[in-house]
């Protein structure tokens, strides 16, 4: 707790540099064991050439467990039990499963939230303007992965500078598509159970195993 108060006082006394904010954010999330939040996800541009807005509920438990439950406009479910990841869209009647990468290979934004990877080790940080639609008073930290990623070119974390809570997440992929997540009703260290991240493959669906990425 002493380090957290010291970091907070330092950041309140002057505008933090990008490395200082990244380090403080990493230390904050090292103390968070689980959390939940409502989310709004907007995707625009890229291969779809249109804007889509979806909503749902996110729950995460370290290390590596997460559940993205999309509820509108279409039901979708993305689950990681810490060892395997599952993607399920009921309308498609298909489950895609893959293994969770090791910590030193996990720079996917969602996996950082789940305690995989490390901001100061895996990314180069810089401060940028606050993305449109994000909460006023937040700080925007742009993170460029030091190792090239297939899913995205860079990401922006939107952070509450007083609490270091993540209010939003923006990623841009190689096709120019932008995914923006905004988080509300965030609750931390509530004692989520492992069973909340178990996934049972529904009957009558096709199961596809995704190949490991090189």
Model-identified regions with their sequence ranges:
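An acidic-aromatic
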Residues: 57-108, 179-180
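Short, solvent-exposed helix-to-loop capping segments enriched in aromatics
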Residues: 29, 106-120
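Short beta-strands and strand-coil junctions in structured, solvent-facing domains, enriched
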Residues: 45-46, 67, 74-77, 87, ...
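Gly/Pro-enriched, hydrophobic low-complexity segments
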Residues: 96, 118-211
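A generic structural motif
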Residues: 40-44, 69-71, 88-90, 144-146, ...
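N-terminal leader/targeting segments and the immediate start of mature chains
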Residues: 10-54, 201-214
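Sec-dependent N-terminal signal peptides
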Residues: 3-11
């Amino acid at each position: 707790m002493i380090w957290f108060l010291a970091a907070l006082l330092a950041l309140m006394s002057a505008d933090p540099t990008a490395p200082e904010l990244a380090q403080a954010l990493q230390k904050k999330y090292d103390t968070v064991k689980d959390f939940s939040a409502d989310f709004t996800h907007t995707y625009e541009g890229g291969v779809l050439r249109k804007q889509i807005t979806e909503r749902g509920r996110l729950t995460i438990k370290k290390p590596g467990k997460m559940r993205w439950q999309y509820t509108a406009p279409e039901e979708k479910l993305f689950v990681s039990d810490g060892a395997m990841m599952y993607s399920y869209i009921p309308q498609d009647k298909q489950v895609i499963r893959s293994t969770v990468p090791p910590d030193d290979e996990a720079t996917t934004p969602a996996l950082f939230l789940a305690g995989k990877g490390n901001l100061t080790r895996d990314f180069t940080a810089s401060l940028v303007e606050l993305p449109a639609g994000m909460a006023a008073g937040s700080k925007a930290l742009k993170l460029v992965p030091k190792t090239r990623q297939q899913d995205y070119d860079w990401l922006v974390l939107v952070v509450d500078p007083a609490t270091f809570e993540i209010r939003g997440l923006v990623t841009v992929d190689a096709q120019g598509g932008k995914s923006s997540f905004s988080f509300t009703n965030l609750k931390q260290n509530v004692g989520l159970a492992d069973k909340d991240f178990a996934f049972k493959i529904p009957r009558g669906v096709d199961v596809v195993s995704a190949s490991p990425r090189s």
